[in-house]
Amino acid sequence: MRVIPQFGDTCLQQLKNIDIQKWIFSLQKASPRTGKPLSPKTIKNILLNLSAAMKKAVMLELIPKNPCDDLTLPKLEHYQPKVYSMEEVETLLQCARNTALYLPLMIEICLGLRRGKLLALRWHHVDFQTGCLTVEENLVTVNNQTITKAPKTQSGRREIQIPGTLLRLLKGTKAERHAGQNDYIVCQEDGSPYKSDSFSMKFRRFLKANDLKHIRFHDLRHINATIMLSLGISPKVAQERLGHSSYQITMDIYSHVLKKVEQEAADKLDAALFEQNPA
């Protein structure tokens, strides 16, 4: 969307590295429309799409070299997830009760799905007999259209056991839905799926309206993982439920939580062995 207004009238053979570099620098300045610069991640994604097109042009021998090579990009900012305490989670759910956000928040806190996976859920993904949820689709927005896609990796498709309280909530919600509505579990009033950005905006407005600590919707996934590991649930089980492609990814992301759990285990072992008979 940003590339065409900038370079749409430029002849392919005349597009130079220096032109793209100047454009990158301009994207890092405050936008007249929003008053804010684009994030480094957004700029990187824009350049990835442009570079892919230029790479194709090189393959077709339309240009000799990819003008997107050797560009200086802004450094990506490492985001530190914000985690709610159990008391804050309870307050969040209390504020959301009787609102359209209650069900998606319950799903997210109990299952820790990525946003696109959550929004792609349909009723046929829930097996009410076994209490199992099948995660196999991802909802994305392409050219302002909402579509579902298959996961990129095998670990992205998985089956998760649903906690009893959430399963009962899902049953009750399904019974209340009007016949003929779209099959999406998390949906707008007319039954249509949310666009990812508009859903995140709805969540941010909810937090602000209820004077709750600001977190990203994705942070709820980290909250789910932190709760699991703090309860002593095996990191391997957490990996499978979260859909991480490897055990090491789970260990790397949540090493700080695991250190705390390990210390608690050491303290319990110490108490069990030596509280009555100190060494």
Where are these regions (language model features)?
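Short, polar N-cap/turn motifs at the start of nucleic acid-interacting alpha helices
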Residues: H125-C132, I233-I253
